[in-house]
Amino acid sequence: MAALQISSCASQISSEVLIARVMQIHASISTLSSLRPSKQVNSLFSNLVKLCILPSSIDITALPEEVQAMRESLINLCGHAEGLLELEFATFLSKIHQPLNNLNLFPYYENYVKLASIEYRILNESGVSQPRKVAFVGSGPLPLTSFIMATHHMKLTHFDNFDIDGAANDVARQIVASDPELEKRMKFETGDIMEVQEKLSEYDCIFLAALVGMSKVDKVKILGHIRKYMKEVGVLLVRSAKGARAFLYPVVEEQDVLGFELLSIYHPTNDVINSVVLLRKPAF
């Protein structure tokens, strides 16, 4: 998760030891009465991320059935915890003076800065440096990627943030309202992206958050829906995961993006969690 990216060491870890330790942490997380930020919650998830960014040669597709089931459960727990962490901090930010000038108070802000820089470089290398209009699907209560892109990289671009949670959008909207210039070019839409159709054709670039479509079936459906309605030659940036990082996030594979032109795939080897898959809808 972007919110929990931390520094790794260079130690190699065997698949057997990795799986055993991940299962142990999953068991501990599963017994918690709440995933709201606390010393215990933060410690467990920090240890999990440290483990998953260690160099390893694990093949996620070859995991035994019971380990795959644990992995799916763990991804859901990670997503829930990340959402609660962002909501708590976004609520705090919305109540202070100049919240957009204080984003760096968020403990993992620099990790979002790193990821946004990587994604902007990938877009720039594919000729998409200053899109007129961008959509971010699954923006949440603290849409740091949109904030960073809009203020550091795409300073004239209009951003529409889509989230299924109206309360999350309300908090994010309060933060943006503190900056009249940014508020003019950043809006929030509440609803299921599967119900958004013609509007998707307005965007030069669409970001798909890693936790939108938690299961393989849902992810493929969402990718197909976006491809159907997005503009021709528009680009879609999808966050994925590789290796042990796939205990934290769903994986998007090449067979999941049929009908798209695959422009590039980036896999991190440092403290960044997310892989980045850049796609283009072909012109027909």
Question: For each predicted feature, which ranges?
Answer:
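Conserved Class I S-adenosyl-L-methionine-dependent methyltransferase catalytic core
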Residues: 46-129
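Conserved SAM-binding loop of SAM-dependent methyltransferases across substrates and taxa
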Residues: 141-156
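Conserved SAM-binding motif I beta-strand of class I
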Residues: 158-164
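S-adenosyl-L-methionine
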Residues: 170-203
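A short SAM/SAH-binding and catalytic strip from SAM-dependent methyltransferases
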Residues: 193-195, 202-219
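A short glycine-rich, Lys/Arg-flanked "PGG" loop and its adjoining helix->strand segment in the class I
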Residues: 220-235
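Conserved beta-strand signature within the Rossmann-like core of class I S-adenosyl-L-methionine
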Residues: 233-243
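Active-site capping/gating segments
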Residues: 244-284
